[in-house]
Amino acid sequence: MQRDYLIRVETESMSDFKRLNSLMIGFVIKGEAHIYDENNMTQCNSGDIFIINHRDLYRFQLQQDGIICYIQFQMKYLADKFDDVHCLYFHLTDATTTKNIHQLRNIMARLVSTHIRHNELSKLTEQQLVIQLLMHMIHYVPRTYHSNQSILNDDKVNQVCDYIELHFHEDLSLSELSEYVGWSESHLSKKFTESLGVGFHHFLNTTRIEHAKLDLTYTDETITDIALQNGFSSAASFARTFKHFTHQTPKQYRGDRPAITENQQSAQHDYHDRELILLLNDYIEEMNHFIEDIEKMNYKEIAFQPTNHQLNQFNHIIQVGYLRNLLNTQYQSQLLTCHHDFQVNEVLAYDVIPYIMKKLNAPFTYDAEISNIFYDIDLCLDFLLDHNFSLTMHLDQYDSRDYIDAFKIFIHHVALHVSHRKDLKFNLYVTTLHTSLIEMIDYFKALFPNGGLYIHLDQATERHLPLLKRLEPHIDHFVFDANSNDAVDFNKMNDDEFKTASQMIINKTNYLIDLMHRHRLKRPLILLNWNTLTGDTFITNGEYFRGGIIIEQLLKLSSKVEGIGYWLNYDLHVSHCKNERDYMNSIELFHQYNGKRPVYFTALLFNKLTSNILYSDDTCIVTGTDSNFQILLYDAKHFNPYLALDNQMNMRATEMIHLNINALEEGMYKIKHFTLDKENGALFNLWRKHHTIHGMDKDSIDYVNRMSFPKLEVYDIDITDTLALNIKMITNGIHLIEVKRYPSS
């Protein structure tokens, strides 16, 4: 039976060049080796990897005590695994990162060690490692593509050679091959001899004999079987041809070589199996994934281009419900964490005027000499002032006289409280318009000239256009809501609905921009309550990972919207919702026990982008400068969130993105690679695994919060011109890569 691949350890040099009719990858186990090709010599030291491609001339020159190992793949085996073997021309370059070199060497060391050990499961383990090696080469080693459709006449001889290597075991003729390349028989024969120095039939028989030698050496099959499976019509024909090329009969050739069993062929010369295994162990590391589960590959070439576009960062507005919630030390800590990680500086609180009216109308009278009805409010204001937060307060049902009077008392007190300190940035937000707002805003502006007025904008606002025009000089922002879940019926599986829902937020934004333009209203927008597709239950909201979808929306909105709103945490959010559907109108940053939700990390990663855009497309944006830049890649797939609950219908897909950043200045660069996806940073799965009917204890809480973070990889790389990155993208995942060149020494 023809062997699919060979696994060898070599301690002796080759005396002559040989043309490889297969694909070879190996590394130096010990010492030093010189690898020669037609034009160059490459010096390889211990641990260095080498690759010799199909049809290349090569020679090994091992220095004293040098040992190399290699895996040699037969082209017929590769042709069974790949649609186009012409794509399997590999180049080890600066673009092959140290991490990927380590992983290739790791797999090969395991493979050779397994081959030498030859235990009960060696063959099965070998086959798994061989597939792993090929997958890793395909994904992480740069390749050159040669399409059969674009081969020029000068390359047609090579095309014939490749065809022979894949089909040598079949009945081949000069007539068949000339038709294959579109030449006449005489022209092909002439070109073949000119290019290779031998005729077509000589080359065909040489190829068959080389493969037959392997079978004679490594199998115990009969000579007749070997003859037939290598393209000879009979054992007699095989024997004549074999003796012509080797000056031996097949039987003599086999007899001159000792019987080499599967576990012995790698342990020749001065090294015993145990010594080789000990040497190989130095290169074996822990492997995270045994088989790469890549379903699709994508190739992206990026060259930085000057652009007039800028990326705008958002002002983040955090909803906390009642103002008194700011007295909670856990909530204070969460706000400060947000402020540190992505510059949160504005808090939105519910209307405090009804609370003040209740105190003012209490059956007993507060004595101003011994008490302060604003005591708890003052503590909240002090926290905001101490940490440079601005306060936006939602005014609700403000059309009564009692309300207006209480409002003025409150505003006057706040002005007095902050007068001896730095100014408080104070804003008012209304969702409905009433003429009493004019009196209130005049009083407010007299005490807080830098204060802002936020007006909720929707179709109903048009009915109050005259009042809106009167208030326009005081308006700082228009506020709106947009929830993609409102656009679909989750009981249906209509893809068109989900496609429409994916555009719902940006479509509503554009509608409001157009409405403002029609009525000559020019103010920045704030998207306060919003959500992407999540389904209409708490479970789908957690299971449906959508980091990439959120990033997609943020990028689309960055040039149209100035502010983005979030609820601070789950408990505050859910306590102000009527039902699950109402809960889906907004997004919170924290879950319980200070667990950070993926949207928190999405905001954090987005904040790492800078304003200068170097490159952008539908799934990638690069910002910064050519020596200090940020690459953001994301996947955004909109589908019914209920499918995320169906284990039988796995909506998780994996794509390998081969990314090249070209024309970089030569030097040493630092790479920081953040990965946020369902396997790295998703809180919900870990939460459910560690949650019991009695909740979670401290150990579980600490563990879940510690593990629910994006993955971070940091390394240095020496770049001469091109930065090559291999990125494993899971459905709706996000990758942020920060690249910074070190100063020249």
Swiss-Prot record:
Pfam families xrefs: HTH_18
Xref: Gene3D superfamilies: Glycosidases, Glycosyl hydrolase domain, family 39, Homeodomain-like
Record keyword Transcription present: yes
Keyword Transcription: yes
InterPro entries named among the record's database cross-references: Glycoside_hydrolase_SF, Homeodomain-like_sf, HTH-like, HTH_AraC, Tscrpt_reg_AraC-type_HTH
GO molecular function: DNA-binding transcription factor activity; sequence-specific DNA binding
Annotated SUPFAM superfamilies: (Trans)glycosidases, Glycosyl hydrolase domain, Homeodomain-like, Regulatory protein AraC
DNA-binding region, residue range(s): 175-196, 223-246
Keywords in alphabetical order: DNA-binding, Repeat, Transcription, Transcription regulation
Domain HTH araC/xylS-type residues, every copy: 158-256
Listed PANTHER family: ARAC-FAMILY TRANSCRIPTIONAL REGULATOR, HTH-TYPE TRANSCRIPTIONAL ACTIVATOR RHAS
Name by which UniProt lists this protein: Uncharacterized HTH-type transcriptional regulator SACOL0084
Species in which this protein is naturally found: Staphylococcus aureus (strain COL)
